[in-house]
Every structure is written in C-alpha cells, then in structure tokens.
Amino acid sequence: VFANPYAENFQFGYDYNDVKLDPNTQFLKTNETPKILYLDNSEDIYDYLSEGYIPIGSANFVSNAASEQQVIQQAKKVKAKLVLVQKQLLDQSLELKNVSERSTNQWFYNIESVFLVKDESYKQGSLGIIVGELPQELTKKYQRNTGVVVFLVYKNSPAYRANLLRNDVITKINSRDVWEDNFLTVLNDEKRKSNNVILSILRDGVDKKIPVTLGW
C-alpha cells in the first residue's frame, strides 16, 4: 500500500482551533464530496477566499505519483470542502532502471495544496474587506505610516460593488485618517452618522476617492 503524500505532509494552520470552534464554520459533511481544483497561479486562491473560503491546513511535497483520490481522501479526513492544488513540473527527471535494464524517466512535480472550509460570516460586516498594516515596501513607497492595505475584497460586498480592489491603500474614511488599530472604530463611528461614506485610497500611487454605501 502506497503512503498518501497529502496525509503524510499535511499540517493544520496555526488558527485551526479557532476556526474549528467557530459556529459559522462550514465543514465537509459526511455525505458530501470535496471539490478539488487545480490552479495555474498561486494568486488565483484569492478568487476563492473572496467567496468565504478559509484555509485550515496545507500539504506541500515533491512526488511523481500523487493522485486525485489521495487528495480527496485527505480532504474527507480533515473535512475540507475545497482543496486548491498547484503542480509544477521540476526541471529534471529521474532515470530509473527496471529489472530488465530498460531505462524509464520519472517526472516529478512540486505540489502545493491548500485545504479550505467555508465561512459566510463576512456578510455581517458593513464593508466586506480584510485590511492590515502597511507592509514595509508600501510604507517606503508612499512615505507614510498611516493607512491600511486591502488584502481581500469579498465578492458582492459593498466594497466589491464600489470597485475597491485588493492592494488598494485606504488612507481616510470621510475626512478621518485611518491605520490598522483605529480602522474599525472610525468605520463604525462614520457608519453611525450615515451609511454613505467616502474612502480616500491610493492605487498605483494615484489618489482616488471612492463612495461606498455600507451594508449588504
């Protein structure tokens, strides 16, 4: 019996226990079949994160024989609804000789896989984005400490409908400066005044103002 590389190399994410205990988390049910999708580009994962999928673990390894049945088996074990797999052919093949002295080439792949569950609690938010502190390269690029970078825009959210994009930098909500620590406080303060707010953003170095109607 061949070992399952997806099981042997699987690691739960650091926040798995929080995800597991969250009543909003939707795990794979006993009668369900997990979806297995193959990505060409690692950036494509954001398309699925924006639909409310969240990672619970991953398995990364090199193999010449990993099968789809094996990834399905591991997905069922950890109750993942979706697995995103990226395969990259390694530059060199390995020459093997069988008992009859015939040479065969074995092609090996670098395989990266992410196991995900669903959580639609993001629809309870008023804006529908995930933001964080400006990374060092943006702090240096824009010569500023304040502001937040948009890591994710949920599909069909108020931010999505207003055409806010991933990697935009939000500098103000209405006339108030924002940064990671005060962003939610300012957003909630301004929402109490009106569901219509103006976001000042930096996109590719250009200042823009985007009107957003808060709430789903």
PLM regions: where:
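Short acidic, glycine/proline-enriched helix-loop-strand junctions
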Residues: 90-124
